A protein has these predicted regions:
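Conserved catalytic cores of very large enzyme subunits
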Residues: 1-288
Length: 288
């Protein structure tokens, strides 16, 4: 719960210092599950000292208390995001990414699966509004990754996919990403494919390799925002003429570039301590 509480405070602070959406991954909370497990195990050992309790029974007690902690932690994220208001008077536009493939080892993957399961279960239930009716909250938005160990009956994490599908049928979340297609389509200059969350609600960053490390970077990556081309409007404006379509398309692209440059120039000369959580502590960059 403390890790989840701090996560929601960071979410609120970041949202209050910008207008766009933001994304977090449950993988970044997974390491704290084992921290809680060890703390609870120490408490149980102290409580059971001198009693004739088997190691198996102690493990059962630890896991039950751990599940209860995870339940409270996930509930903290869901309810705080719904009830928090940013300084802009809005709920934070937050996306929660659920990708088992991000886990660094088998234990972390199993712990991540517990968090994902609890997150989906709570979203399926919904939250109560002022009238006490269970409703579907707009945020956090959920994204679930389909991968090799959760798409076939009999796969170790297939139960999560079944739970996600049940939740989608009722709550219209989570959305889904195919790991297989992402690895095919999002290939960096090193020739490696990557699966990662979108930036906020919908915009996917292009593959990028940090020149300082030679490694891909997607989290905490400075991005000034997105400009969208309305292709339907371009098509209608062309009147069915292909040459005119491409001419208008090129003009709109140039306008997009101008819009992005306007944002860039607006930020030139701004000291990083104008919004430390964004520029100095990693929400967007780690500048000095």
């Amino acid at each position: 719960p403390p890790a989840c509480n701090i996560a929601t405070q960071i979410i609120a602070q970041v949202a209050s210092n910008q207008y766009g959406g933001q994304s977090i991954s449950l993988t970044h909370l997974a390491p704290f599950v084992d921290v809680s497990r060890k703390k609870i195990a120490a408490e149980v050992e102290a409580e059971m000292e001198g009693l004739d309790v088997s190691a198996e029974r102690k493990r059962e007690i630890v896991e039950r208390r751990l599940r209860s902690e995870i339940n409270r932690g996930v509930q903290t994220i869901q309810y705080q995001v719904v009830t928090l208001m940013t300084t802009n008077g809005q709920a934070p536009f937050i996306t929660v990414f659920m990708y088992l493939g991000e886990a660094r080892n088998a234990q972390e993957k199993a712990d991540l699966a517990i968090i994902i399961e609890e997150t989906i279960r709570q979203r399926y239930q919904g939250v109560k509004n002022e009238a006490g009716v269970w409703i579907t909250p707009a945020f956090p938005k959920l994204i679930y990754v389909l991968e090799e160990d959760n798409i076939h009956p009999g796969d170790p994490y297939y139960y999560l996919t079944e739970l996600a599908a049940k939740c989608t049928a009722k709550r219209m979340v989570p959305d889904y990403i195919s790991e297989k297609k992402m690895l095919e389509l999002k290939v960096d200059k090193n020739g490696e494919g990557h699966c990662y969350t979108c930036m906020g609600c919908r915009s996917f960053l292009t593959p990028y390799v940090d020149p300082e490390t030679g490694k891909p970077k997607y989290y905490g990556r400075f991005n000034q925002g997105v400009v969208t081309i309305n292709l339907v409007d371009v098509a209608l404006s062309s009147g069915g003429n292909f040459d005119k379509f491409w001419k208008i398309f090129d003009e709109r692209l140039a306008l997009c570039h101008r819009a992005l440059q306007a944002r860039h120039k607006r930020l030139l000369g701004t000291p990083s301590d104008a919004a430390p959580i964004l520029w100095q502590y990693g929400a967007l960059a780690r500048l000095k």
